[in-house]
Structures are given as C-alpha cells and as structure tokens.
Amino acid sequence: PISSGRDIGQTLVDAGVVKSVGAFVRQFEKTAASMSIRPGTYRLKQQMSAAGALAGLLDETNRVDSTITITSGQKMSEVKKRIVDIMGVTEEQVDAAFADTEAIGLPSEAGGNAEGWLLPGSYEVSEDDTPTTVIARMVKGTVDELDRLGVAPADRQTVLIKASIVDGEMNIDKYMPMVARVIENRLADTNGETKGMLGMDSTVLYGVGKTSGVPDQADLDNDNPYNTRLHAGLPPTPIGQPSEKAIKAVLNPAEGTWLYFVTVNLDTGETLFASTLEEQEKNREQ
C-alpha cells in the first residue's frame, strides 16, 4: 500500500495536482478506502489539497473511461466504433490503422482482414497509444493464443473461422465441442443431406451486416459469400472475435455423427443434436 500511495502521490505532484508526495501518502494511508482506487485516467483540478485529490480519485465519476473491451463474438465493426469512442479519433484513422497490416502485425494468412484476429479482453488505452498500437496488441494476443494452443500458422485462419461460427451459434460451453463437430461433419458431407453447406444463421446475419437476431427471408435469399445456406464450405473470413473456449472446441470436437442441432429451451439453452433431418424435425417439435 505504501509504495502504491507514493506512486500515486508522485504522479499527482508531476501533474501539478498536489504539492507534496508526503502529505498525499499520509492521507492515503489513513483512509481505508484508498485500496479501492482503480487504475486509469482521472480528471482532477490542479493545486488541490491531499484530501481533495484523494476524494477525487475515490469518486468514480472522475475516472475517464480509457478501456476498450472486446467480448467473444463481437464484430470488427463494433470494435472499430469502440476505438473511435474511447480514443477520440475518426473512423478514417481507425480504418487506416487496420489497413496497415504490417504495422498491426496481422499475419499474411488473414488475407488483409483483421476480423477474428482481435483477442477478446480489456485493453487500457494510454495517452501514448494510437489506434495502431492498440490494434497491434489485440492481434498479438490472438497470435500468442494460437501459438500457445499449438495451431500451425497454415491452420490459423481456418481455426478462427470455425471458432467464430461456434461462438456465433452457441454460448453454452458444454455444447461448443458438439457444434464444432457439426461443422466438421457438414463440411465432409458433400454428397449427403447437407451437400457440404454449413447452413448457419450466424454467417447469414454477418453477410447482411446484422449483429444479432434471426435471419428473415430476404437475409436467407441474399447471395453473398457469407451465406452458408447458398454456398458450400466455410465463409471467407471469421464472423467475429472467437473465444478461447470456441477455439479449443474446434481443436478438439466431440465425437458424433450430428449434422443438425436445435435449441429447444430458450431459458436453459438446452440443445438437441441430430444426425438426420427426420430426427431434427422431431427435435424441433419439442
């Protein structure tokens, strides 16, 4: 506690908020709530008393939101908007940062598109950061994660595409490896019932720029490369930023012959898996 109080005091002295580190440390140490001060950037006046400065740090309304949070399944368009909002930059500046694939460290197998390569998590933005430095951290996080999980560079993009679909279709951990198996089975089933088509709503929605909901008929009829009801195989890129759980599910899918699944209880998320369309129709009736 003493060192953290001293560190904060020194920062405040350097910024002209308080005159004396010692006075701030004394105030810090006799205030039990001091330990709840969160890291971050705060708006404080200059030339405050030690007690006033400490009170200012304990008031969350003075904390400037400098965190960019990426959640599993979030689209790159949503991440871009967050960068614009938090960093106070323009959309054009963010687009330019994403376009400089070398500067953000985007591997060549991504094909120039960072969708799926922005590791979910919280990123604290400092005054020294630019859109490029922040995006580079997100990309490096994904590269490091894939390396840690033993994914060969040649397989990275395919794994991220599949994992992003798993996340798009399923948010209950126990079913993720089963959904991953459905993807594998459908890709292999080129001459069977599903004719190699994934038929996944999450990809259809992505193709028409929707982030959630259920596709309507116009969405299902929209002929774009992400419409896996019209096109066999995988979509050209991931459809969001995949979670580590989804990536692990893709790397180790459950054993099974399923080609279909349907959630039968929206409250519990209970999902039934089927190997034939006939079986799927029976499950749908539940």
Show where each model-derived region lies.
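Bacterial extracytoplasmic/cell-wall-associated proteins, especially those involved in peptidoglycan
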Residues: 88-89, 104-286
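Signal peptide-directed extracytoplasmic domains
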Residues: 1-146
